[in-house]
Design a protein with these regions (language model features):
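Short, charged/polar micro-motifs that form catalytic or ligand-binding hotspots
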Residues: 3-6, 39, 46, 71-74, ...
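Short, charged/polar, low-complexity loop and linker segments
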Residues: 1, 28-37, 61-76, 118-129
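Surface-exposed polar/charged interaction patches
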Residues: 23-26, 30-33, 63-66, 101, ...
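Conserved alpha-helical segments that form or flank metal/cofactor-binding pockets of metalloenzymes
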Residues: 51-58, 97-98
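Amphipathic alpha-helical coiled-coil/helical-stalk segments
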Residues: 78-80, 85-87, 92-173
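Leu/Val/Ala/Ile-rich N-terminal alpha-helices, chiefly Sec-type signal peptides and the beginnings
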Residues: 1-53
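Terminal, compositionally biased segments
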Residues: 1-18, 147-190
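Residue-level signal for the start and early helices of compact helical domains
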Residues: 51, 69-72, 181
């Protein structure tokens, strides 16, 4: 297996950050009506965040198992990428919670009366603020995920540059030489 290209990993993390940013915008701007419409519009967002979280987890495993882990300063980047995995997972949880708060229109158990329009309206009115809160929390976590990916990409680039700087051979420079007679005054005999 060829060695991991850290420059390529940094670029892939920048791409992942852009995907988190795009999903953040989609979650922030999602428009829905409680019920089936909300399920139809929020479900793809949940699936996408799970995909991005899995990608972040794969990147974390690749970097942790590479020569990058031996470079000074890499721990901060690895921990930051682990926080991206956590934040994106929390975003998925928030989207799932929005779906859980969604008022579904299924039939009640046998023997219970079906909801009338006033009850449905009240259920929707209760659900909307909860769903909106969960969606706002998901958007926040996605924003943190994007920022984390940018930080890690920058950290990799910085750590590589520092490591290359340390491996350069040291060139000694010599200062100007002074002639011994020019720097001393002659002795006076008595």
């Amino acid at each position: 297996m060829p060695p991991l290209s850290l420059v390529e990993q940094a670029q892939q993390l920048r791409d992942l950050a852009r995907q988190f940013e795009a999903l953040h915008a989609r979650v922030r701007d999602v428009s829905y009506t409680p019920g089936t419409d909300a399920l139809r519009r929020i479900s793809p967002l949940l699936l996408k965040v799970q995909d991005l979280m899995a990608t972040a987890l794969v990147r974390l495993g690749a970097l942790d198992g590479s020569e990058y882990a031996d470079i000074a300063g890499s721990r901060a980047s690895l921990e930051c990428l682990a926080s991206v995995v956590a934040a994106s997972s929390l975003a998925g949880n928030d989207l799932a919670s929005a779906l859980y708060a969604n008022p579904y229109e299924g039939a009640p158990f046998a023997g219970y009366p079906a909801d009338n329009q006033a009850v449905r309206t009240a259920r929707h009115a209760e659900a909307i603020p909860r769903m909106t809160g969960h969606l706002a929390d998901a958007a926040h976590q996605l924003d943190l995920s994007a920022i984390g990916c940018h930080y890690v990409a920058t950290g990799i680039t910085r750590d590589l540059a520092a490591a290359q700087e340390q491996t350069k051979p040291v060139q000694r420079t010599t200062g100007p030489t002074t002639a011994p007679s020019a720097s001393r005054t002659p002795r006076v005999r008595r």
